[in-house]
């Protein structure tokens, strides 16, 4: 909902139905319907009320009527949801040690992949404060290329590979639509414009604002993303259980990443800490560019791409020299201070 509830408290008209309440806002032409098997009169009372030993159901729909039998439909949805996750976790290779913790962690990671596109988001909500009152409340409901590598690695370690294939399609779609440099993060649909805004009319978690939507980091230059993208998808190109290496588009995608690494080896960036006000040379960025070249070398050798192998070798040598130079600068800076 694009208005983020800004206009709902003003001009919102609750309309009472037989088993629902319809909230309409004529200013923005939007409606929300709450359908329930509870007495509707309860919702118009100022007193609190308690349900004892009964299952009751509430369904919130956006501008649509809920026409099915509410109890049966909700129970059916619940059963199907539980069954889906039980089947998924049964397919995971999880040892007995810390099994409970690993299962819960795996479910959380899986829940953060948007099934329609393969995007993996860093958080399911926005603006939880890093520390109460600090003002460092950010919107992480986006797909960070860097973070996706670690999520996919964790999932493949427990035998889940479909997530990697879905993410590969997501990244391929982004690079096809936007042949320029890779951003550090994208929206779940691959959208690149993530302008940051503060919502002053929301108080935030435990009144520790501000509440932000969007993230300015989409404008940052973070050159480690090319290496991160390459190694995140490396198993797809080198593991014989996957067929992606037989796709002719693979060669073009890997060369695209190598081109970006070649163009940004000596470039300053915002680094892993996403500094908002200045750019510098960062060992981390150069290291992952080197890792990306090593991954390209493995892909080239396994699939017989001689031109790619030669190109990756040249970039590896250049990147090695650049990394040494950056580390030397860092050592001198530490001694100076």
Q: Which residues are covered by each model-predicted region?
A:
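Acidic, mature catalytic/reactive cores of soluble proteins
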Residues: 1-337
């Amino acid at each position: 909902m694009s208005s983020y509830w800004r206009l709902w408290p003003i001009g919102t008209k609750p309309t009472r139905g037989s088993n629902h309440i319809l909230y309409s806002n004529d200013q923005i032409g939007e409606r929300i319907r709450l359908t329930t098997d509870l007495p509707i009169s309860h919702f118009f009372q100022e007193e609190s009320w308690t349900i004892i030993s009964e299952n009751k159901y509430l369904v919130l729909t956006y501008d649509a009527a809920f026409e099915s039998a509410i109890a049966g439909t909700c129970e059916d949805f619940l059963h199907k949801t539980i069954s889906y996750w039980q089947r998924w976790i049964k397919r995971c290779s999880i040892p007995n040690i810390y099994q409970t913790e690993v299962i819960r962690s795996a479910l959380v990671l899986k829940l953060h992949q948007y099934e329609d596109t393969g995007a993996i988001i860093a958080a399911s909500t926005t603006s939880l404060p890093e520390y109460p009152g600090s003002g460092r409340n950010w919107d992480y409901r986006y797909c960070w290329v860097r973070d996706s590598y670690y999520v996919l690695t964790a999932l493949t370690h427990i035998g889940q590979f479909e997530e990697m294939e879905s993410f590969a399609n997501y990244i391929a779609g982004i690079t096809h639509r936007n042949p320029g440099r890779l951003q550090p993060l994208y929206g779940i649909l691959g959208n690149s414009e993530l302008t940051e805004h503060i919502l002053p009319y929301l108080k935030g978690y435990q009144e520790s604002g501000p509440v932000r939507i969007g993230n300015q980091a989409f404008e940052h230059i973070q050159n480690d993303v090319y290496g991160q993208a390459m190694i995140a998808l490396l198993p797809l190109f080198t593991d014989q259980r996957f067929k992606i290496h037989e796709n002719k588009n693979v060669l073009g995608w890997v060369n695209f990443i190598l081109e970006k690494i070649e163009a940004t080896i000596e470039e300053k960036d915002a680094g892993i800490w996403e500094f908002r006000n200045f750019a510098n040379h960062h060992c981390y960025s150069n290291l992952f560019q080197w890792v990306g070249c090593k991954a390209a070398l493995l892909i080239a050798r396994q699939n017989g791409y001689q031109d790619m192998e030669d190109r990756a070798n040249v970039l590896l040598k250049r990147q090695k020299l650049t990394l040494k130079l950056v580390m030397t600068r860092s050592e001198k800076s530490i001694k100076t201070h």
